[in-house]
Amino acid sequence: MRTKQNNAGNFKKKSIYIIPERSKINKFCTELTGITPQLIEEKGIYFEEACEKIKDEYHSAQLTWAGFGNFDKEQIMEQCDYLGIENPFSENYINIMYQFKKYNGLFKMMGLKRALHFMNMDFEGNHHSGADDAYNAARILREILR
């Protein structure tokens, strides 16, 4: 689940679906994310493959990466440790939630949808879809960096 800015300043969405190894896709997961067992069966790859793909396609070890909060970063680090593989990302990480709070002089953190609303932006796509969440977080970061 990545976003990449093209030369026009627009973001391009791309999803990588991971085959779960310690759980199954259940009804709750499907309702929350839109990911179905059939989608994973058709397009899913193992976490290790996804890490290699990210390294190869994005040269991610050399780039700063970002997320809205630390949850995704921690999950990636934990899974890499669990599997004994190298994290495909650099140590340079931007916590967009924290930067948003700091930029706006807020005392409390807020979720992605509320942060967008605070900036007079609508959430685009499906909340909890990795690609859509990444896209919307990138929109916030772009506004902060202007």
Question: Which sequence ranges carry the predicted segments?
Answer:
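Metal-dependent phosphoesterase core characteristic of DEDDh/y 3'-5' exonuclease domains
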Residues: 2-35, 55-146
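Metal-dependent phosphoesterase signature
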Residues: 31-53
